[in-house]
Amino acid sequence: MTVIERFLKFVSFDTTSSETSGQQPSTPNQKVLGGELVRQMLALGICDAHMDDAGYVYGTIPANCAKYLPVYGLIAHMDTSPDAPGGPIHARITEAYDGGDIVLNEAQGIVLSPRDYASLQKHVGKRLIVTDGTTLLGADDKAGVAEILSAAEKLLTSDRPHGTVKIAFTPDEEIGEGADRFDVTGFGADYAYTVDGGAIGELEYENFNAASASVEITGLSIHPGSAYGKMVNASLVAMEFAALLPALETPYFTDGYEGFFHLTGMEGEVEHAKLSYIIRDHDREKFEARKAVMEKAAQEMDRRYGKGTVTLNVRDSYFNMREKIEPCMFLVEQAKSAMLELGIMPKVQPIRGGTDGARLSFEGLPCPNLCAGGENFHGRFEYVPVEDMEKITELLATIIWNIAK
């Protein structure tokens, strides 16, 4: 199978993860896809390919040379984001892109346009895999899954020397649980790369420090005709709480190394309201300061409306892996070198998000992130260029081959 054939097969599985199921993996189709991956790995000759009870898929490509080499891992995730419908996905491949609009769904008037997504202009002349405008595509991260398996095929069918390579495919990365039950010791790699980035050339070893915050607000209901000086409307208190946070420090207004507060959910009535936030910043001190701002806002609401009005729960999710990667920057340099060898321009940049590798780096497995090729993740305008997936497959194999030189 080609990398494109693999990818189109994998996106036919709806593997949307769920934050509310309480299961592991969070949705059953992730294990269905995992079974398919194990079958393909066994067919390639990866004899120890298996899936554990939690839905993690593992396998080993043995070294084909006597030289002592560190063991490297390649990791991608099987789930897709719950932010957009995950199926049924009707993917199609365009002809060579001409730089104009791409009609995704004529009946619904859904168009992928360079006026809205300027990155399309980089791909003139390439074939693009797109959706029908009703679902996401799943290049995040099934492009990475397909590229790893296709690179594995290259390694297994070539006489070029390489060391031992470990492969892992994780569930539930999109809901922040991809590393929860990852068996770092059993995986047995010294170093690894996640293949979970965006456009070709992206190479990342910095990510957000991340936390989630739940704001529970208790109000007091009374008949509005006699509510003077008595009613505490929890929904209005929620609005006041939100107004105390910096208005220009949301995802819409921030970029690069700038952090943010992101309101991800809200519900409310008079007696009870709830706000759900995620907090992000690359700088650890600024990250801690953001959490302190949330605490101060909660205290102010209690001052205005009485102690116990607001219950704030903040939970750290993951931290910036930079401090774990900097002692082994050769991981970044050897990826850059392989890119340049293949005519890919490296783009080293911070991740405005997180990866499984961020958490794994803190568990003793340094794990920077490589491009998977897709763009516009988590939405119906997601796409991935065919030629870039083919080149990234070559990149993964080249990194492994170069380590053995």
Annotate each language-model stretch with its function.
Residues 2-28, 130, 318, 378-379:
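N-terminal capping segment at the start of a domain
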Residues 22-69, 73-75, 79, 89-90:
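A non-catalytic alpha/beta surface segment that caps or lines the substrate-entry region
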Residues 67-161, 169, 189, 391:
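Active-site metal-coordination/substrate-binding segment of hydrolases
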Residues 153-166, 247-254, 405:
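Phosphate-handling active-site elements
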Residues 236-253, 260-262, 309, 319-368:
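Active-site-adjacent substrate-binding region
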Residues 269-271, 346-403:
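Zn-dependent metallopeptidase/amidohydrolase metal-coordination segment
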